[in-house]
Amino acid sequence: MLDRLQYVKQRFDEISDLIIQPDVISDQKRYKSLNQEYKGIKALVEKREEYIIVLANIDEANEIIADGSDAEMVEMAKMQLDEAKDRLPELEEEIKFMLIPKDPEDAKNVMVEIRAGTGGDEASIFAGDLFRMYTKYCETMGWRTSVVDMNEGTSGGFKEVIFEVTGEDVYGTLKFEAGVHRVQRVPQTETQGRVHTSAATVMVLPEAEEFDVQVDMNDVRVDFFCSSGPGGQSVNTTKSAVRLTHIPTGLVAQCQDEKSQHKNKDKALMVLRSRLYEMELAKKQEEDAKKRSSQVSSGDRSAKIRTYNYAQGRVTDHRVGLTLYDLGNIMNGDIQKIVSELQLVNNMEKLKEASEVY
């Protein structure tokens, strides 16, 4: 393991030198990539230092015990040895997880799209509940959220809502939320008290930079229209809303959240770029998932991933068989237990795949 960590230390020193070079700073793509790598391995370099200290403590304690000339020093050395031997396997496990190659997309900001599925008005209300859940979670993580586009439901919630999330390691945290979310509850409009099942689809798109995806504007049809509010009524008389259609793929992105037509066009282009990037990413994830029979990252955006059962106060994630009877807090944004479990399973899969390294 020390050999592998030595390589990490060499790479860290190399990057530390590179990111202060003027030619690197002037190359936006390279600088950003190196900066992300620097942040990613800094914690690992610190763990390496701790690992070296623990190994040195074991050697030192063994020497003192073997010498045996000072009884008091021997007792202290035995305590030091026990402490170091307890810490060593923990530290090795932590380092193994940190050595797992990170997806380069994990550090990216995201576009989250929530669409009401089967279930009519109730599905729209549920889409609104999911939107609230995610924005609350983002708040606790210190991330910023910004609505890009929305289409409100007739009885509340959203037929569709798209919002941007910016912060640290956003995609790496939220990527496993993509898929079909199902709710089982008695709708507000239900007079007979019957439980209905509705669904909403969540898409999590890593935000693509201009250098990730080149969009030829000759392939894009641009339409301008008036922004609309609830029920479709026009909320302004200027055509500030923008719809972009990517002709080769048929993908459509629009934005009407900003008052400025120029800003709406920029945001719509950002969504379009992210959707094109995600298409390629989904293919790659599907191939990777087949290789390692992944539980949590199938690349299948139509897979039912989670059920929210209100009568039982239960949330079940079907991919990892996790059931929590804490629906109230979860719907209020406390989804960290679910996120952590999904990340753990994904890391265990990667660790198994890369086990020959260790």
UniProtKB/Swiss-Prot annotation:
GO molecular function list: translation release factor activity, codon specific
Residue ranges of coiled coil: none
Gene Ontology CC: one annotated term: cytoplasm
Compartments it resides in: Cytoplasm
Pfam families: PCRF (PF03462), RF-1 (PF00472)
N5-methylglutamine, modified sites: Q233
Record flagged with keyword Cell inner membrane: no
Top-level lineage group: Bacteria
Post-translational modification: Methylated by PrmC. Methylation increases the termination efficiency of RF1.
Keywords: Cytoplasm, Methylation, Protein biosynthesis
Classification via HAMAP family: Rel_fac_1
General function of this protein: Peptide chain release factor 1 directs the termination of translation in response to the peptide chain termination codons UAG and UAA.
Family statement drawn from the similarity comment of this UniProt entry: Belongs to the prokaryotic/mitochondrial release factor family.
Protein name per Swiss-Prot or TrEMBL: Peptide chain release factor 1
Organism: Flavobacterium johnsoniae (strain ATCC 17061 / DSM 2064 / JCM 8514 / BCRC 14874 / CCUG 350202 / NBRC 14942 / NCIMB 11054 / UW101)
